Amino acid sequence: MKRMKLRTNAGPLQGTIQVPGDKSISHRAVILGAVAKGETRVKGLLKGEDVLSTIQAFRNLGVRIEEKDDQLVIEGQGFQGLTAPCQTLNMGNSGTSMRLIAGLLAGQPFSVKMIGDESLSKRPMDRIVYPLKQMGVEISGETDRQFPPLQLQGNRNLQPITYTLPISSAQVKSAILLAALQAKGTTQVVEKEITRNHTEEMIQQFGGRLIVDGKRITLVGPQQLTAQEITVPGDISSAAFWLVAGLIIPGSELLLKNVGVNPTRTGILEVVEKMGAQIVYEDMNKKEQVTSIRVVYSHLKGTIISGGLIPRLIDELPIIALLATQAQGTTCIKDAQELRVKETDRIQVVTDTLNSMGANIKATADGMIIKGPTVLYGANTSTYGDHRIGMMTAIAALLVKQGQVHLDKEEAIMTSYPTFFKDLERLCHD
């Protein structure tokens, strides 16, 4: 088996980095642009494989989408402009694509079959199947957990619902809201904990109306959306890898440019500051929720991460676990059972990967207990088809002084950060 040899024993990281566009916002710009009326233009779109799956799905649904002058141009014809696809919609590795597009297609008068790759086919879709069924959609997957492939027959006469989310999931909330835009009457979604709110913000940006009152979101449908010009900020989930690298590799100083800092996504910044990180915000634009972040090597101490903080840093927990292996004392991550149904069981995979390199991590049902600081050593590792595990391992390898680190299935990183290794080499040489 051919494995990629990762860079080890890195000196200080120096330089400036512009991380790729935010994945969550890129998906939603394409989805809302496809059903808005008029020409939507998107600058700074992430061209990772997940977002390309969303774009291809809408092309198969009859939407004209093309690239012009470094922008994505979407010719939306409104909700009525979608047409029945001639083929199965393949969502690749993207849970966001499958769940949000299922919600959107709930109100369409045709049937579709949605499939995914091996990893996506192991991710439960019961969380969207149940609320969409309540709205009058015929939708089903495999077994009780409703694993893909999904078969969906839309309904032009969707029923509004009031739905309390059993789990904290922005994807489930978004699927219901996208369906609610096509339902006649008042739909309410009640969250357990506040999750990322890009869907609510962007529905309003596209001229839609909804009311957010704490954990309750109210939307009266049906509504039409109007095309917009969207600029996608850098993805804080991608910036997180460089943030952590800068904090744990002695002598490092990095400037992360144009990072999106929507408050529902900035949990990692609060955590690292509590742990003692030296970070400075430059050129902060509060209205656009964008800033540059200067990070320097810091001595860190362990912390507790739990409760309402978890949905605000759920995707950053693998790299936070690595950070904790280099902090003084114990870091405890709780209430994060959602990690077990991501692209992989991230609790188990993070624990196994970092422990194989010498870390001291105990997996729990809903998180991890991490003792630090520990020296990391060479090991044979894999992404297990999970982009965030791959990038976490590549950053961990930089700390290794003894032995080699080999990584299997590194192509998974293309999902969200196609230029990751190129950027890594540049920061090691600047």
From Swiss-Prot:
It catalyses: 3-phosphoshikimate + phosphoenolpyruvate = 5-O-(1-carboxyvinyl)-3-phosphoshikimate + phosphate. It comes from the Bacteria. Keywords: Amino-acid biosynthesis, Aromatic amino acid biosynthesis, Cytoplasm, Transferase. This is 3-phosphoshikimate 1-carboxyvinyltransferase. 3-phosphoshikimate binds at residues 23-24, 28, 169, 171, 315, 342. Pathway: Metabolic intermediate biosynthesis; chorismate biosynthesis; chorismate from D-erythrose 4-phosphate and phosphoenolpyruvate: step 6/7. Phosphoenolpyruvate binds at residues 23, 95, 123, 171, 346, 388. It comes from Streptococcus pyogenes serotype M5 (strain Manfredo). The gene is aroA. GO terms for biological process: amino acid biosynthetic process; aromatic amino acid family biosynthetic process; chorismate biosynthetic process. GO terms for cellular component: cytoplasm. It is found in: Cytoplasm. Belongs to the EPSP synthase family. It is an enzyme of class 2 (transferase).
